[in-house]
């Protein structure tokens, strides 16, 4: 009964005349004047099966009771379809199976939604509650297959380059890595907790101290953080670490790996080396540290042109150490009314902007609410700086650099999508390099690591650690694809004294550093090699390669935006007995 000879989608005209055995699900059933037609589906596709009393009355009798999503074992002969009945939209559309035997392996209830790609119009909550049905859809299977092919290409490449696939602990200690940890109470050690790893960062560095030299892992990671469309509480990363390698060596190897992934999953050849862009350039031109380079509309600094204008919004911003930047919406003058531009201003306000100034370029100069503040010379300079022409709309932001970059950068992306400027078929990879080592929080009066506390400063900047730490650059690099951060890496600190100075800079007392990272500091005393690595988000990579916009579509059993599983109803309550075993009590129950 289980001797399948073909997958449904693999039968071609070459098999005409063969007797075959197929397994699968009923996609559709049609009863037409004594004949019953069934579209049989498996993971490869669909084939039409015909039940004809002239071939087998017994098979026809069974087929009369079959419904959608029944699981069948079918025997029959491959026959060419009659002229006029060929389906050019189906891979198997030139043939059909004349059934001479059928076994119902399992019956099925009517599913809550049709098993087709049109089901994407159904509520996502319904699909997630019945995820095992959702995964039957061709688009979902293709995404799962793409994910498999990506990891297969990654494993193959790293294996060919001498890497060892080594697992690191899932139950580990809690360390401050940015997001909140998921904590696991210990039954044996009363009042103590494990943490699920936010990344294998410390373990992979310790593997370098161990002399492994080349490590990788398709690693599960966990972060208890606020969610959004491209984040999940549990996620998978391609985790890589190497000893005795420079930043350029690691970037070169990572992009060669991505070239193999693109070649084997999308049939595309990446042009190597990938473009490099400094962090400062990305922020200045794109208003983002993960620039989408598939379209122009770059941010242009016009501070020098407008710094002495009588328009106080501009002149005051520059005088107070801020900037004035602008973007040119090509051909946008006639497309946006004053009301439309006000709506763009409201959008920019979400990113801290206090307003959005604008002018439209006409044949005799610029027109708009602030045009009167620009004499002919300033108008000419603005038009030249922004490469503007008649019919263009110029949008201005004036504030501190961070606010202008964030608001105009977000506005650029919004307008790029709305105006159809983005070629969705493009895969624009690039590296963002020369990152600042630290970020300063003026409210708290302290520094935070821009990446993580284990990133090595640029060697030449080490002398600034005591005098001007805010000016230090990091040996760090992010890989960006189409405006998404695929992942990042860095050369790591491997000398105890530098690591201790970094901890101190981040506000750790010597006692706190020893308590939380003492094992790492001690390991560095036993001959730690220079090392570095990179971690790339597998879920996000698959999302982009599949042309999806939501990480949940790339994970077999994802969580919702509120970090719950609708299918298993996790998280859920546990019994008092379980809590007692773990020496826990619930402080206060809050009903949702």
Swiss-Prot record:
Q: Which reaction does it catalyse?
A: tRNA(Asx) + L-aspartate + ATP = L-aspartyl-tRNA(Asx) + AMP + diphosphate
Assigned keywords, A-Z: Aminoacyl-tRNA synthetase, ATP-binding, Cytoplasm, Ligase, Nucleotide-binding, Protein biosynthesis
Q: Per the record, which residues fall in region Aspartate?
A: 201-204
Annotated positions binding ATP: 223-225, 232, 485, 537-540
A cellular-component GO term for this protein: cytoplasm
What residues does the record give for site: Important for tRNA non-discrimination? 84
Family annotation (PANTHER family):
ASPARTATE--TRNA LIGASE, MITOCHONDRIAL, ASPARTYL/LYSYL-TRNA SYNTHETASE
Q: How does it assemble?
A: Homodimer.
Q: What is this protein called?
A: Aspartate--tRNA(Asp/Asn) ligase
Per the UniProt record, the source organism is: Bacillus subtilis (strain 168)
Classification from the root reads:
Bacteria, Bacillati, Bacillota, Bacilli, Bacillales
Which gene name does the record give? aspS
């Amino acid at each position: 009964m289980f001797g399948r000879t073909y997958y449904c989608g693999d039968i071609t005209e070459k098999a005409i005349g063969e007797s075959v055995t197929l397994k699968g699900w009923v996609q559709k059933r049609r009863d037409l004047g004594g004949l019953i037609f069934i579209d049989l589906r498996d993971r490869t596709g669909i084939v039409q099966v015909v039940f004809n009393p002239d071939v087998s009355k017994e098979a026809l009798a069974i087929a009369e009771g079959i419904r959608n999503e029944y699981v069948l074992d079918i025997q029959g002969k491959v026959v060419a379809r009659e002229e006029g009945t060929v389906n050019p939209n189906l891979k198997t559309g030139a043939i059909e199976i004349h059934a001479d035997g059928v076994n119902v392996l399992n019956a099925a209830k009517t599913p809550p939604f049709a098993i087709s790609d049109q089901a994407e119009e159904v509520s996502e909550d319904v699909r997630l509650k019945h995820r095992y049905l959702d995964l039957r859809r061709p688009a979902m299977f293709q995404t799962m297959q793409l994910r498999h092919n990506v990891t297969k290409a990654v494993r193959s490449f790293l294996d060919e380059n001498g890497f060892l696939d080594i697992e690191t602990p899932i139950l580990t200690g809690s360390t401050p890595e940015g997001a909140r940890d998921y904590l696991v109470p210990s039954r044996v050690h009363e009042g103590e907790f494990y943490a699920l790893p936010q990344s294998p960062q410390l373990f992979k560095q310790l593997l370098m101290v161990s002399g492994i030299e080349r490590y990788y892992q398709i690693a599960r990671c966990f972060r208890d953080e606020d969610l959004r469309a491209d984040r999940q509480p549990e996620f998978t990363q391609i985790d890589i670490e190497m000893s005795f390698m420079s930043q350029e060596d690691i970037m070169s190897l990572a992009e060669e790996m991505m070239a193999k992934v693109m070649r084997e999953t999308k049939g595309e050849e990446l042009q190597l080396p990938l473009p490099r862009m400094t962090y400062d350039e990305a922020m200045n031109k794109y208003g983002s540290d993960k620039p989408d380079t598939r379209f122009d509309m770059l941010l242009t600094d016009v501070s020098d042109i407008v710094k002495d204008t009588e328009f106080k919004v501009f002149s005051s911003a520059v005088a107070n150490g801020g900037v004035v930047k602008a973007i040119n919406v090509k051909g946008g003058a006639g497309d946006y009314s004053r009301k439309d531009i006000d709506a763009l201003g409201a959008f920019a306000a979400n990113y801290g902007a206090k307003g959005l100034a604008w002018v439209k370029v006409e044949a005799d100069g610029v027109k708009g609410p602030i045009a009167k503040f620009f004499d002919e010379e300033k108008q000419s300079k603005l038009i030249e700086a922004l490469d503007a022409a008649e019919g263009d709309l110029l949008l201005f932001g004036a504030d501190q650099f961070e606010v202008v970059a964030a608001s105009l950068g977000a506005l650029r992306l919004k307008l790029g999508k709305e105006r159809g400027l983005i070629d969705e078929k493009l895969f624009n990879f690039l590296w963002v390099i020369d990152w600042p080592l630290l970020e300063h929080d003026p409210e708290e009066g302290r520094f935070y690591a821009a990446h993580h506390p284990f990133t090595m400063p640029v060697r030449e900047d080490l002398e600034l650690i005591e005098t001007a730490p805010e000016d230090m650059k990091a040996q760090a690099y992010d890989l960006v694809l189409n405006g998404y951060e695929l992942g990042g890496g860095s050369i790591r600190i491997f000398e105890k004294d530098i690591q201790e100075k970094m901890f101190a800079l981040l506000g750790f007392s010597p006692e706190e550093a020893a308590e939380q990272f003492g094992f790492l500091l001690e390991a560095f005393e036993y001959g730690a090699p220079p090392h570095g690595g990179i971690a790339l988000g597998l879920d996000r990579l698959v999302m982009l390669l599949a042309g999806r916009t939501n990480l949940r579509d790339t994970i077999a059993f994802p969580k919702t935006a509120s970090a719950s599983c609708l299918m298993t109803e996790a998280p859920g309550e546990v019994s008092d007995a379980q809590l007692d075993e773990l020496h826990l009590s619930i402080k206060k129950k809050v009903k949702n």
